[in-house]
């Protein structure tokens, strides 16, 4: 058959029509648009936040789906089509310059999000994310509401948990510094409260701890550990003042295990997030030693009870321990102040 312009045009139209039918029309007719088991509708504030998210191109850096190969936050549940029921437009993103946000709801408190949107470096000094302060307070609140919606019913449970513990954390903070620290320590399991830091606070370990502190903790707890970092003005309760811990050691000698547990798990209800997905064990112990030495002026590193030292550890005597008489005087002063 001779190829003529007429045949070419008709053939092209038929191929195009077949493609559209197979890829658009038939799926649209046969596809069941049903919500997933965790889906919940957005309220007006959350819808406004979704529009802000889309209009400002947040999906250029963040995705909204969990894949079968994912291992990080939200990986407990793989994304399903019904999760995005009635989401218009359903822009899921393809890049992960920033973290996936499909299960962001309840991961952080509202005040953490406010500080983060005003300046992402306030909550993560290494963040590449631009500041969204220009949006204004109302739009930041709407965007925060949308963040807290992501995860749907699973997010609702996490948000409720944050709100429950926030009330208790604020009450403890208002009771005074020492009462606040006592309450915070009571939330740590006993075996952790009575556990010293098992690793020596060597010069190298403190240098590593300082680097971690500057990269993760600086803008909340401040350069001198007094809880007056740049983000503190947005947080209620504010970040902990480490310099008050020396008179609040567990059994007047332990602090390492408390640091480790609270850095690993965060303090739900406050802006203190968990770091168990970002920092492996040695880094948490190192930053614990750094905070203890530089801001508390004391570390329980390598005191009893202790096990066998790791093969790479150098011999090290703890120069930051107080003599028994000084420890006794500190305890008596604490009692007199109550």
Question: For each predicted feature, which ranges?
Answer:
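Short extracytoplasmic
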Residues: 40-73
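Cytosolic-side transmembrane helix boundary signature
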Residues: 1-7
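Short, surface-exposed glycine/acidic/tryptophan-bearing loops
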Residues: 82-83, 230-236
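Hydrophobic membrane-insertion alpha-helices, especially the h-region
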Residues: 9-25
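Periodic glycine anchor positions in long extracellular repeat architectures
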Residues: 222-227, 266-269
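Flexible coil segments in periplasmic/lumen-exposed cytochrome c-class electron-transfer proteins
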Residues: 26-36, 63-96, 107-110, 119-215, ...
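Mid-length scaffold segments of soluble, non-membrane domains
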Residues: 97-104, 230-233
